[in-house]
Structure formats: C-alpha cells, structure tokens
C-alpha cells in the first residue's frame, strides 16, 4: 500500500574548522536558552504561587522574553545564532512542560555540556550539490551520503557524537510498502537475541561484550592521567569513540533484524518486557543492557506501521516461559539455567525459547480473537535475508 509518512535520513557532516566553531556556539547557545528559560519558568511559577495566584510562562511569553534578552548587551552574542533554532528550543521546552503536566513525563531537566549536543532547524534548509545549507551556514556544510536528500525538507536536527557531526533530515515521503504474510511470535532473550515461533533464532550481537576488555584497558589508562591535562582529554575521546563504535554496531544490527521481520510478517506478537526490572538482577543486568531491546522495539514498531502490519503486545507477567506450548501445563520450577523445556504431563520436549515464542504467538492470537494457528516451518526467505545481512542465524 502507498502511504504518506515523515521519514528521517541521517547523514554525516564534514564542517570546516570555522564551521565547527559556529556549530559549537549553536550547541552552547541553545543549551543556554533551555536552561535560562527552564529556570525562568520554574521561578515565575513559584513566585506566583506564593502570591496565591499560580501562573506559568508559555511559549509566547518566553519568545517575547527572548527578544528582550537579545537586546541586552551582555547577550549580544545570541545574534550569531540562528533565531529559528532558539525559537525551536523554546517550543521544545514548552512541549516538555506540557508532557509533565499531562503526567506523561517527569519535570524537565537542565541540560549539561556532557549530555547530548544538538539544535533544531525547523525550516529554511536545503541541499546544494553535496552541501547542506541552513541558517547562519549559507556557504553550506559538506556531507557524504549515498542517499539522495529530498527537496521537501521539514526539519533538520544537527547533533554531535564525540567528534562527529550529523544531520538528521526529516522529510515527507510517499512510498509503496507491501505487507508481509504470516504470523509470528517473538521471544527476546540473552542466549539468543530473538527466537521466532517458526524456528528462526538469531544470535546476540553483544556489542559491549566484544569491546569490554579494550574499554576497561583504556579506562585504566585514563585514571593514570593528570586531571585537566591535554593527555587526559585525549584519553577521554578515545573512550568515547569506543562507546560510539558500540552504539553504531548495535544500531546497525537492530535495523537489519527489524527490517527483515517487518518485511516478511504481516502480524508479529511480542512480549512487553520489564527491562528496568531485569536490569536490577545483577547477574544479567549487563547482558540485558547490551541487547538494545528498547531500540529494536522502537524500530520494529514504526517499520510495521509503514506496512500497515499488526504488532500485538502481550503482558509482562504472562507465563510464556513456564507454560507448555503443547498442553498448557505450567512448570513452576523452571529455572533460568534450563535451556530445554520438558513437560512432565504430556512429555513434550522443546528448546526453551522456541516454546516461549510459540506461547507468545498463541497468547497474541487469542488476544485479538482469532484461532490458534498450527506450527509452521521456518520461512526460508526471512532466514536468508538475515544471513545475508551478516547475522548469525540458526533454525530450530
């Protein structure tokens, strides 16, 4: 089917040294505006509440205050910064307060220099050749990407990750996506990143585990460097680059897996995992964090939506692991170390994760009021695409 959607294309930027200085000024100025008006809104509300008439500052009031702020000689440096990006920071702050008052989010936090650095360009962005043109960068910032950047750009988010600069370009797209066929239940795990009810099992990437020894070595070297020294700063960058490599590898892995699943299945049933609860278990906390399940879930959600496919969620506390997928018996003494599920009632024996994924599938089908399907063999096209992407795939 053909649908209209807002898509994002992330490209790496290659700014000149002068442009890097201006980009850093944009990061710092937008961070300053966020913190300044977060403090202003908090103070204004507290003072008005003390007077018995609690009131808040909205976007329009803060926009007016920003204009007044720029007229103060102390803040004349704000004129070097794209005004539209500063306005967008005020809008984002206003949205954060709206989410808080609707109880959808916690109270907005102050931004730190050590946090994610970004600013938003809401309009007036375009591409000229191999350069991205945004306000205050009329000469264009160089980029390299195989993808063609569309003309109808809705918004650009400029970010820095360690020493790399990126532009996330949001644009409207009308594309044809074919809905997959078949229904599958998916069990997320640590021994196997994913086990599907049709027998596909994907080994985990374990991006952090692969870099763990090197990371520990570089962190030991950091502890030996003098605080405030140039060598310590360089060592910090080394460590940040390792974390960057881990994030990049995990993102690439999750994209490949989520794309293959969304492409080949029309209905996917998953379990709503209590990831925060699992991270409190010290024996598996590091492995749970290393999987990147939240990122995978987010990717799968929007890719299924593109295809008008169904993503069904079952509850966290459903007995998917302890239930026999053949007779429904609950095995209360099942241990985490038990990799094979054996039912004493019907003598059914199966891989533990495959048994759980079949239960997840059945629970999802019952939830939407359809009959339980029969077990289907591995779809060869799905397994082939996953293997082609460099992933380690097994069939059960």
Regions found by a protein language model. Give the residues of each.
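Short polybasic amphipathic segments
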Residues: 125-126, 130-136, 192-196, 339-342
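Substrate-contacting helices/loops that form the catalytic groove of nucleic-acid
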Residues: 46-75, 153-155, 161-184, 188-297, ...
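Secondary-structure transition/turn motif
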Residues: 131-141, 169-174, 199-200, 347
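Acidic carboxylate diad motif detector
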Residues: 59-161
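Gly/serine-rich nucleotide phosphate-binding loop at the start of the catalytic core
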Residues: 1-86
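Short acidic-glycine loop/turn motifs at beta-strand connectors
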Residues: 128, 161-162, 197-200, 327, ...
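Positively charged, low-complexity nucleic-acid-binding target-recognition regions
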Residues: 2, 6, 175, 286-287, ...
């Amino acid at each position: 089917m053909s649908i209209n959607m807002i898509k994002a294309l992330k490209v790496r930027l290659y700014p000149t040294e002068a442009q890097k200085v201006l980009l850093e000024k944009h990061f710092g100025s937008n961070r300053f505006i966020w913190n300044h008006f977060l403090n202003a809104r908090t103070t204004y509300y507290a003072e008005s509440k003390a007077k018995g008439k609690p009131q808040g500052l909205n976007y329009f009031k803060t926009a007016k205050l920003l204009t007044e702020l720029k007229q103060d000689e102390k803040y004349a440096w704000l004129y070097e910064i794209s005004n539209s990006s500063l306005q967008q920071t005020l809008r984002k702050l206003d949205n954060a307060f709206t989410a808080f008052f609707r109880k959808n989010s916690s109270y907005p936090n102050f931004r730190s220099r050590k946090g994610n650095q970004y600013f938003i360009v809401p309009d007036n962005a375009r591409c000229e050749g191999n350069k991205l043109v945004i306000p205050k960068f009329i000469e264009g910032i160089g980029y390299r990407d195989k993808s063609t950047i569309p003309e109808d750009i809705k918004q650009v988010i400029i970010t820095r990750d360690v020493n790399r600069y990126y532009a996330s370009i949001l644009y409207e797209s009308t594309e044809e996506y074919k809905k997959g066929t078949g229904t599958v239940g998916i069990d997320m795990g640590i021994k196997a990143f994913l086990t599907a009810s049709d027998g596909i099992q994907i080994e985990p990437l374990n991006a952090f585990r692969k870099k763990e020894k090197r990371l520990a070595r570089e962190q030991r070297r950091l502890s030996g460097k003098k605080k405030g020294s140039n060598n310590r700063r360089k060592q910090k960058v080394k460590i940040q680059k390792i974390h960057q490599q881990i994030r990049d590898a995990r993102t690439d892995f999750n994209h490949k897996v989520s794309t293959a699943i969304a492409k080949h299945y029309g209905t996917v049933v998953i379990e709503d995992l209590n990831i925060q609860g699992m991270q409190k278990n010290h024996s598996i906390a590091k492995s749970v964090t290393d999987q990147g399940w939240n990122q995978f879930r987010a990717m799968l959600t929007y890719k299924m939506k593109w295809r008008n496919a169904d993503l069904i969620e079952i509850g966290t506390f459903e007995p998917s692991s302890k239930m026999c997928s053949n007779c429904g018996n609950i095995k209360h003494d099942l241990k985490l170390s038990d990799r094979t599920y054996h039912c004493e009632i019907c003598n059914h024996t199966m891989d533990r994760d495959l048994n759980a994924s079949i239960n997840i599938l059945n629970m999802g089908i019952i939830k939407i009021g359809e009959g339980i399907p029969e077990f289907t063999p591995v779809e060869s096209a799905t397994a082939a695409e996953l293997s082609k992407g460099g992933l380690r795939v097994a069939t059960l």
